[in-house]
Regions:
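Short acidic/histidine-rich active-site segments
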Residues: 45, 196-212
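Charged helix-capping and loop-helix junction motifs
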Residues: 21-24, 124-129, 154-161, 182-190, ...
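Hydrophobic faces of well-ordered beta-strands that scaffold small-molecule active sites
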Residues: 5-9, 40-42, 81-85, 109-111, ...
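An N-terminally biased module of ancient metal coordination in phosphate/nucleic-acid-related enzymes
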Residues: 1-76
Length: 242
């Protein structure tokens, strides 16, 4: 195995709830590297204007200044740190150009599931609208942490149509190991057993939520076998750029 590919982390300062300093970002990357990750995407939140972390000019500037500092520091170890964003679905559902949010070196945009304030039809419908607009731009939506969306947790079968549309569902590794609570853990395993999951990522936010997908890899391997688990972690399901 060449190493893990982690498409979802908040390890570069951007003014969101992830790494606060370049030094913290470097140390988080060290944790990822020592745990076996070789390609790591730094994906700060890009929320709607009314939400916690809108992608303001100030936040973009902070991220663009911090990113090369972290990237260059970790490159010497052999860790490939890449740019990206975690996009709130209403941004691209409402027509914003998704090409500004692409995961570097891929044809993918990471779109997050919304929170508790929508019912299941509203949540899945909003994500589907965003995914269709990403697809119209010639890109592939990767749909982040459906298991942490309460309406989906109440009705896990609701996301099958998203997976059947060819849109990769991406679980948080910590959900599989119980670190996001019993409901997220139960839902994550249900989705995995239903065969609708394509990718597992860390969604790391700091030292309390580190970028270690090796722990989830061990748990999934114990459940379904290493050969079946590996494609969820090695980047095989990521739509890489030609």
């Amino acid at each position: 195995m060449q190493g893990f590919v982690d498409v979802h982390s908040h390890v570069v300062p951007s003014g969101d709830d992830g790494a606060a300093t370049v030094d913290e970002g470097v140390e988080l990357c060290r944790i990822a590297f020592e745990a076996g990750t070789r390609i790591l995407f730094a994906t700060p939140h890009a929320h709607a204007d009314w939400d916690h972390f809108p992608r303001t000019a100030g936040r973009r500037d902070l991220y663009e200044r911090a990113f090369p500092l972290v990237r260059d520091a970790v490159a010497a170890w052999g860790l490939d740190l890449r740019r990206g964003w975690e996009v709130y679905p209403s941004l691209v559902a409402d027509g914003e150009d998704p090409r500004g949010y692409v995961l570097e070196g891929t044809r993918a945009v990471l779109v997050e599931f919304p929170g508790w304030w929508l019912d299941v039809d509203g949540a899945v419908g909003l994500v589907a609208d965003a995914a269709r607009n990403v697809e119209r731009a010639g890109l592939v939506p990767i749909l982040a942490h459906p298991e942490r969306c309460p309406p989906v947790a109440a009705d896990p079968a609701s996301v099958r149509r998203l997976a059947e549309a060819g849109w990769p569902l991406c679980l948080n590794g910590p959900s599989l190991t119980g670190d996001h609570g019993e409901t997220a853990e139960r839902t994550a395993w249900r989705l995995l057993e239903d065969g609708v999951v394509s990718i597992v990522a860390s969604d790391a936010h700091g030292f309390a939520r580190p970028p270690r997908i090796d722990v989830a890899f061990a748990a999934v391997s114990a459940k379904i076998g290493r050969a079946a688990a590996l494609p969820l972690f090695d980047g095989g399901a990521v739509p890489w750029a030609a």
